[in-house]
Amino acid sequence: MGIRAIVVDTAGTTTDLNFIQDVLFPYSVKALPDFLEQNQHNVLVENCICDTRDIALEPDADLARVTEILQQWVSEDRKATPLKTLQGLIWKQGYAHGEFKGHIFPDFIEAVKRFSAQNLRIYSFSSGSVDAQKLLFSHSDGGDLTEMFNGHFDTRTGNKLDKQAYCNILNTISLSPKQVLFVSDVIEELKAAEAAGMMTCQMVRDSTLRTGEFRKISSFDELLIE
């Protein structure tokens, strides 16, 4: 049967976690007040504002309070869909204005080309929105990598710690579990993918990272698919 598709986590796997924590997150926190003020009547932004009120159980929160809630969620690294959607919109402006480039590990840049040449399907699964993932890979320091991908998944597919999310991915891409390899640095995500029947591999780029009973690699150079 063999592996026919690879699903990659982003932060800590294809992308340096420091880029997300030290560049992207602070940028979104700083930009949120003006962005919401200027775009509050945009339908998508308006829906995110309403969803934030619902999740926070503050139906009467004004725009300033909604901004505070969202900024607090950033500091807590909450995986709330309205926050992730808004961050994607804000980062789109940042990329467009040349404020930063998407950091991608060089070994993944080479590997994704190799996998594509092998006719392997490549997907990403992140708590960041699909739009944010596309921005990351299209504005990467290795150029535009989006044509190498067959698709992207985010919190709308499910929580990355839940088995059902990986079952949903399998249903979407129409492959059997053993034909799909999931690569992540997070043990709990690997356990959830394994529970769904997927093949798994832990990316260990940091020697201090907590590891589990999974196949381990420290670079995509070590990931050879026959």
From Swiss-Prot:
Keyword Metal-binding: yes
Needed co-factor(s): Mg(2+)
Ranges that cross the membrane: none
Keywords: Amino-acid biosynthesis, Hydrolase, Magnesium, Metal-binding, Methionine biosynthesis
Top-level enzyme category: hydrolase
Reaction equations catalysed: 5-methylsulfanyl-2,3-dioxopentyl phosphate + H2O = 1,2-dihydroxy-5-(methylsulfanyl)pent-1-en-3-one + phosphate
Keyword Zinc-finger tagged: no
Protein name per Swiss-Prot or TrEMBL: Enolase-phosphatase E1
Organism of origin: Shewanella baltica (strain OS155 / ATCC BAA-1091)
Upper classification of the organism: Bacteria, Pseudomonadati, Pseudomonadota, Gammaproteobacteria, Alteromonadales
